[in-house]
């Protein structure tokens, strides 16, 4: 699963996801893509599950690019533990996704196959997404 090799700090504040994606909102590598429509935190497990669903449907034809990386540590305290006594330990890694962010890109397959593969991948994610396609010039 995806996670940073090392970080400057072990734990982070929760923060908020404001505004729309400035960068990473256009197709950069592939012909087809999956674009986020709402803000949310997407964890590493969801990204990996979506990647597996996409590659499995494509039957190893074409190429997949993952355009998001889980770099935010999410902490949690154990169950039935009283409040206080410090912040909980890191449970999983997540990625803060803003609306308009390109999450996955694929190339080397037909539009029908790409649309279905990305639909299956989108079902694994906790954000509403949209299928996008490069405009022919």
UniProtKB/Swiss-Prot annotation:
Coiled-coil residues: none
* Molecular function via GO: rRNA binding; structural constituent of ribosome; tRNA binding
What are the BP-aspect GO terms? translation
| Keywords assigned | Ribonucleoprotein, Ribosomal protein, RNA-binding, rRNA-binding, tRNA-binding
Q: From which residue to which does the signal peptide run?
A: none
Question: Pfam families, per this entry?
Answer: Ribosomal_L16
Give the matching SUPFAM superfamilies. Answer: Ribosomal protein L16p/L10e
Superkingdom of source = Bacteria
UniProt GO cellular component terms: cytosolic large ribosomal subunit
* Assembly and binders: Part of the 50S ribosomal subunit.
What is the recorded function of this protein according to its Swiss-Prot or TrEMBL entry? Binds 23S rRNA and is also seen to make contacts with the A and possibly P site tRNAs.
PANTHER family listed in its UniProt record? 50S/60S RIBOSOMAL PROTEIN L16, LARGE RIBOSOMAL SUBUNIT PROTEIN UL16M
* Entry's family note: Belongs to the universal ribosomal protein uL16 family.
Entry protein name: Large ribosomal subunit protein uL16
Q: Which organism is it from?
A: Sinorhizobium medicae (strain WSM419) (Ensifer medicae)
């Amino acid at each position: 699963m995806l996670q940073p090799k090392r970080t400057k700090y072990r734990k982070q504040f929760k923060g908020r996801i404001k505004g729309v994606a400035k960068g990473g909102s256009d197709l950069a590598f592939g012909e087809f893509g999956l674009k986020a429509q709402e803000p949310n935190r997407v964890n590493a497990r969801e990204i990996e599950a979506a990647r597996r669903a996409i590659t499995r449907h494509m039957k190893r034809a074409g190429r997949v690019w993952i355009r998001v990386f889980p770099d935010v540590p999410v902490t949690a305290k154990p169950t039935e533990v009283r409040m206080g006594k410090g912040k909980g330990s890191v449970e999983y890694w997540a990625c803060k996704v803003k609306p308009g962010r390109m999450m996955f890109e694929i190339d080397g397959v037909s539009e029908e196959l790409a649309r279905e593969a990305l639909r299956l991948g989108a079902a694994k994610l906790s954000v509403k997404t949209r299928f996008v396609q490069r405009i022919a010039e």
